[in-house]
């Protein structure tokens, strides 16, 4: 089978992980295995743990990683459960972990998943098809206040009140069933000037609903905490984000990992006992170059941040 998936910032991620052929690595967002293939083929006696909440990704990876399955373990799970996954896999410490956040290209391209505002499909948006909450429930059941909040907080949508009001008004007549129905409602709630902007008028709203359905932002803090705790000294944590909300959480978490004593400056000696867990290797995020952007426009918003577990911090 021809392999055409283009993983974002691939070379930069491999360099960031500073790989050893006998190391233990975690790809916490397997997707279509683009990064995992590159990691797996660099291992000899090492091991790769691949995690994804989307069973379709796990199934596809069995073929795409077939030549290296002797060193690969596939796990169907949410990366928020990273600590438990590592324990279950018998991993006492990893030498590198990679997380490529957000919705994957195959999920966007499969209209039936309901992620796209360009193709008609039932309102779903679940990354894990076995999860109970769908976009249909969010759109048709959640209150005006809840809708306005997620549109504003998760979508950074300045027309959140008007869009939330339009959704509630529309569903009073009949349930909103499909993605393009929702797109029309969103467009109808926005002023003409907003419809002429370069960005699709439904992009921010769809992002907000998707984040709410999948609990994406809520999963980040426990994952980041478990990741740094699960690294061996000198191990690397690499995280790719695609929008400012994710990037802000990752940036602050890594800054906190690198921060030592938090005692007030007037204290003569440290009493908090806090020591840095990691050091930042990227003061500014790594972004895609022009060559990658020409081949893969979806890489335009990608930002890679990297931290390294401190040698003097015990697991």
Which residues fall in each region the model found?
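S-adenosyl-L-methionine-dependent methyltransferase catalytic core, i.e., the SAM/SAH-binding region
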Residues: 1-315
């Amino acid at each position: 089978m021809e392999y055409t998936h283009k993983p974002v910032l691939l070379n930069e991620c491999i360099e960031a992980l500073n790989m050893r052929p006998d190391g233990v690595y975690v790809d916490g967002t397997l997707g279509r295995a683009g990064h995992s293939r590159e990691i797996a083929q660099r291992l000899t006696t090492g091991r790769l743990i691949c995690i994804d909440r989307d069973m379709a990704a796990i199934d596809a990876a069995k073929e795409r990683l077939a030549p290296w399955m002797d060193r690969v373990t596939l796990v169907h799970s949410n990366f928020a459960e990273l600590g438990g996954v590592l324990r279950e896999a018998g991993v006492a410490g990893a030498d590198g972990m990679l997380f490529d956040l957000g919705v994957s290209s195959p999920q966007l391209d499969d209209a039936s998943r309901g992620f796209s505002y360009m193709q008609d499909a039932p309102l779903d948006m679940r990354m894990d098809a076995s999860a109970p909450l769908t976009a249909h429930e969010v759109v048709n059941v959640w209150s005006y206040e809840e809708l306005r909040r997620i549109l504003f907080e998760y979508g950074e949508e300045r027309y959140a009140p008007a869009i939330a009001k339009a959704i509630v008004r529309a569903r009073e007549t009949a349930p909103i069933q499909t993605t393009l129905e929702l797109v029309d409602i969103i467009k109808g709630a926005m002023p003409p000037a907003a419809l002429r902007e370069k960005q699709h008028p439904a992009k921010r709203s769809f992002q907000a609903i998707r984040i709410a359905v999948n609990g994406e932002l809520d999963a980040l803090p426990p994952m980041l905490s478990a990741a740094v705790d699960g690294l061996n000294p000198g191990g690397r944590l690499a995280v790719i984000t695609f929008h400012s909300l994710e990037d802000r959480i990752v940036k602050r978490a890594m800054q906190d990992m690198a921060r030592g004593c938090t005692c007030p400056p007037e204290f003569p000696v440290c009493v908090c006992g806090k020591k840095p867990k990691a050091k930042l290797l990227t003061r500014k995020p790594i972004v895609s170059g022009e060559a990658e952007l020409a081949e893969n426009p979806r890489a335009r918003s990608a930002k890679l941040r990297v931290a390294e577990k401190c040698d003097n911090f015990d697991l």
